[in-house]
Amino acid sequence: MAAAHIERHIPESTITLIESPTIPIIGVGESSLPQLRNFFNELGIDDDTWVSECNGLIKNGNEKVSWNGGDDRFKFTFWYDANGLDDWLDDYQKYNLPKESLNDKFYSDKGWQGYAYHLDAELIPTLLKKYTERTTHIIDTIEELPKGYDLYLDCTGFKRKFVRDRNFIDLTSRGHIVNKAWVQSFKLNEKPYNYTESVALDYGWQFNIDTREKRGCGYVFASQFCTTDQALKYFQEYNSDYEPYQGSEPRLLEWTSGFLDNPWQGNIVALGLTSGFIEPLESNALYMIQYSITNLVKTIKRNYNPQSYNKVMKKLWLHNSDFLLHLYKLSPRNDTDFWRYYQKDNTDLTLWQNYIKHNNKWISLYPSSMWANVAVLYDEFSKKSQYTTV
């Protein structure tokens, strides 16, 4: 992604990409946000091309299951008509409408970017190679940086082999306690689902991401409340109706939620998982990669300093963190120690502060429409008048 974008926007650049033949791709299937469309469109890749070549599907949103307790289901969509919210809210409160009626007035396919994608993570690099004609591609595993380059992009993941400043902002104390995931691909037993499904479970949640041939699943959990073996047992039981795709086996992913305070230090820039990771919820990881690349190119072209890049990235990481935490903290679930952990904070006020702040004033990862989705999911509109006057 970085090589293709830099080629496109800094045509005078000379790029060498060194790819290890022994380090596999982490993804089990990727769910994206609508902003990814702009990234690929700028490269000249239309929907039909990359959806077909990446085994992809159009994604219309995210369905939350059991976050509100029981079998409650609610679909977050990307369509947004700002003028429809107040009208819908009046009817919702007067006539006790179902939450799903929000789609009738609040969303518009002419609004906030419309749709996103599901795609096979293993196929994305193959497609992007076609759009990096000037990039020298070397297959090798290196232990030190080659000399003679002006700028190095460290994409070595959690190992962070080459970054100069390892000052890490740990978000665990902020409330990001999910730190492991069992992931596996399964054969589809049914028609592919055009929403990412996020199912709240006892000690975390499971994502289900359908592409045209398979379903990528992962049980994201907090190890302080559930052992790795227990989580594997839960994961296998929950997905017992599905057959592994091409003999796939469960894989364990582990991380510490957080980000580098200074991802650009000297002439080395941390990208992707090297820069940071919070968790898979809300398909945020791929967007953070995308934004770090586009922000880097803008910083270079405007001749800004690395400190300005680092400041913007830190702001986005914290904004990302705020939104994800509200999904946990506003949940009324208290059936396990995991969910009771989040009951100690009252986030009603901060929900509405964020809604107002992002209401068509910021171009951000989660605009006001997404905060409104959270409010509808947890029936926070019944409390709106208490908090929106502050």
Positions of predicted regions on the chain:
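Conserved N-terminal helical subregion
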Residues: 71-144
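Predominantly flavin-linked oxidoreductase catalytic cores and closely associated redox partners
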Residues: 5, 113-239, 293
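Long, low-complexity C-terminal extensions of enzymes
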Residues: 298-390
